[in-house]
């Protein structure tokens, strides 16, 4: 919010552009759902909080595996257009922390 109206700079809020242009020195990747290979920039410090079977283009500086929503713990999944929400139930007990647990510990 700037000068009485909303302001949005697409370059300031585009994570890929910030990384590509070397405007950051630390990248925190959060992904509890996908096992797709995550491309890491080895010139930056990379912290990954994610799926226990995550694959990486290079070894991250820090990797914290977390549980998968709807499998390892209950939760709510929202569609990005906010049309539907789905209650998720825990179906196994793998003893991995939730993302919330990790964030609460950091705060």
Model-derived segments and spans:
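Non-catalytic alpha/beta scaffold blocks inside enzyme catalytic domains
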Residues: 1-107
């Amino acid at each position: 919010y700037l000068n009485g109206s909303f302001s949005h700079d697409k370059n300031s809020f585009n994570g890929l552009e910030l990384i590509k242009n070397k405007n950051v020195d630390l990248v925190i990747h959060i992904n509890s759902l996908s096992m797709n290979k995550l491309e890491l920039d080895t010139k930056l410090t990379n912290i990954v909080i994610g799926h226990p079977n995550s694959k990486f283009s290079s070894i991250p500086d820090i990797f914290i595996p977390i549980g998968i929503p709807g499998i390892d713990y209950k939760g709510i999944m929202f569609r990005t257009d906010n049309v539907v929400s789905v209650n998720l139930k825990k179906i196994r007990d793998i003893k991995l922390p939730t993302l919330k647990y990790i964030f609460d510990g950091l705060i």
